[in-house]
């Protein structure tokens, strides 16, 4: 989360499920909806989750104090849910839908912050 704050990232893309076939694939690094979690000196609040067919879009508020500067960010996480562990998705339609939603946000934000994948 410190990297997100330091780089002022406003988009995170996640292509894996946390669990698949009973096996952990990725750590869940965000809180439940309307909850706040602390990660070191960074506080993350899950403000909203919107479930689209094939992916979830989350709005996360991130706050931290770095070198006596308070930083507050609002970012979007795009979590793709249709990518199987093996082999590849049967269709690209859900991934393309998520990509279009992400690109729209990038175009509207007019920032040059990096996208975290």
Curated annotation (Swiss-Prot):
Coiled-coil stretches noted in the UniProt entry, renumbered to this chain: none
Family annotation (CDD domains): PTPc
Q: List the Gene3D superfamilies.
A: Protein tyrosine phosphatase superfamily
| UniProt xrefs under InterPro entries | Prot-tyrosine_phosphatase-like, Protein-Tyr_Phosphatase, PTP_cat
Annotated EC: 3.1.3.48
Q: Which domain of life is it from?
A: Eukaryota
Entry binding sites for substrate: 85
Catalytically driven reaction(s): O-phospho-L-tyrosyl-[protein] + H2O = L-tyrosyl-[protein] + phosphate
Q: What keywords does the record list, in alphabetical order?
A: Hydrolase, Protein phosphatase
* A single MF term (Gene Ontology): protein tyrosine phosphatase activity
Q: What is the lineage of its organism?
A: Eukaryota, Metazoa, Chordata, Tunicata, Ascidiacea
Q: Name one Pfam family in it.
A: Y_phosphatase
Q: Which gene encodes it?
A: STY-26
Task: Answer yes or no on keyword Hydrolase.
Answer: yes
EC main class here is hydrolase
Give start and end of each Tyrosine-protein phosphatase domain.
1-117
- Protein family according to the UniProt entry: Belongs to the protein-tyrosine phosphatase family.
Q: What is this protein called?
A: Tyrosine-protein phosphatase 26
The species this protein was found in: Styela plicata
Q: Is the Nucleotide-binding keyword given for this protein? A: no
């Amino acid at each position: 989360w410190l990297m997100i704050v330091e780089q002022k990232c406003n988009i995170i893309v996640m292509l894996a499920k946390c669990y698949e076939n009973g096996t952990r694939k990725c750590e869940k690094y965000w809180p439940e909806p309307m909850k706040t979690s602390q990660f070191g000196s960074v506080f993350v609040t899950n403000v909203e989750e919107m479930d689209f067919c094939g992916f979830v879009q989350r709005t996360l508020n991130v706050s931290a104090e770095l070198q006596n500067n308070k930083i507050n960010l609002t970012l979007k996480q795009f979590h793709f849910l249709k990518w199987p562990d093996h082999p590849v998705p049967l269709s690209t339609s859900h991934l393309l839908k998520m990509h279009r939603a992400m690109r729209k946000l990038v175009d509207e934000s007019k920032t040059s912050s990096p996208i975290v994948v």
